[in-house]
Amino acid sequence: MNDSKNRYFVKNTANGSFADIATLFDGVAVLMMTGLSSKGKPVNIYSEQWVNEQEEDFLITTLDENNNPVVIRENVDIELTFIVRKKYATNQENFDVLAKHDAFVDYMTNTDVWLKSAYMGNKYVHCVCEKEYKPTAIMLNRGDNSYMTGTITLHTLDATKVEAVTPQSKQET
């Protein structure tokens, strides 16, 4: 049984619909996704402390349409840790751990993707893999006990967004 079903979602087009990773890639279980709620270091705040003062002067260089300061942050990385194993597949007939692993990694690393976690409500993020990927464990040729694990690091391309919930999309997730 795959306990990660209906918890982690992905799509590879802006207008597409989010699909459950465990359903889209039968046999893949997401173990952990970190960084979705992280905030990067501010890049548009400047401060200076003067020799004869305890207080610092500061400037936030970006303003919104009402002249209110807006902090701009560096984009962060998301880490997606997963396992591919026959026992997590709904259809176990002719299940190939290596082929399923390669298909999943190709999908996640060959183009930009959008990720969403049920643990974070309707928050989602647009990201792309900019780093190399290496499996963390390769245990093949062990019959039904064969598996592969890995962690894919994806760089966010913009700030985390919140998906508008419609009655139809609420039923799907």
Features from the language model and the residues they span:
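Extracellular/virion structural assembly segments
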Residues: M1-T173
